[in-house]
């Protein structure tokens, strides 16, 4: 499945969330990650993020699709990094 994760967390937790997500996904811009995940990886990520955040003040949104080709993705400006050749 293809997943996009967007988060707004307290400044004291940003580095922990970003570091964790970098293990599984591509960092495309501040507070946004995307990538191909298995169902097991997706569930593991959701579980770990629940431990890292404070649900009373932080917010994370998960967008998922069977495949990236089903998403209409457009961007403007300079992306953070080229992820087209990452295996």
UniProtKB/Swiss-Prot annotation:
UniProt: Mg(2+) binding residues: 8
Q: Does the keyword Methyltransferase apply?
A: no
Q: Name one Pfam family in it.
A: CRISPR_Cas2
Q: Which cofactor does it need?
A: Mg(2+)
* Record CDD domains: Cas2_I_II_III (cd09725)
Q: Does the keyword Signal apply?
A: no
Tell me its EC number(s), please. 3.1.-.-
Q: Which GO terms describe its biological process?
A: defense response to virus; maintenance of CRISPR repeat elements
The record's top EC class is hydrolase
Keywords, comma-separated and alphabetical = Antiviral defense, Endonuclease, Hydrolase, Magnesium, Metal-binding, Nuclease
Signal sequence extent = none
Recorded GO molecular functions are:
metal ion binding; RNA endonuclease activity
Q: Which PANTHER family match?
A: CRISPR-ASSOCIATED ENDORIBONUCLEASE CAS2
Query: What does the UniProt record say this protein does?
Result: CRISPR (clustered regularly interspaced short palindromic repeat), is an adaptive immune system that provides protection against mobile genetic elements (viruses, transposable elements and conjugative plasmids). CRISPR clusters contain sequences complementary to antecedent mobile elements and target invading nucleic acids. CRISPR clusters are transcribed and processed into CRISPR RNA (crRNA). Functions as a ssRNA-specific endoribonuclease. Involved in the integration of spacer DNA into the CRISPR cassette.
Its assembly, as annotated, is:
Homodimer, forms a heterotetramer with a Cas1 homodimer.
> What family classification does the UniProt entry report for this protein?
Belongs to the CRISPR-associated endoribonuclease Cas2 protein family.
Q: Name it.
A: CRISPR-associated endoribonuclease Cas2
The organism is: Methanosarcina acetivorans (strain ATCC 35395 / DSM 2834 / JCM 12185 / C2A)
Its taxonomic path starts at:
Archaea, Methanobacteriati, Methanobacteriota, Stenosarchaea group, Methanomicrobia
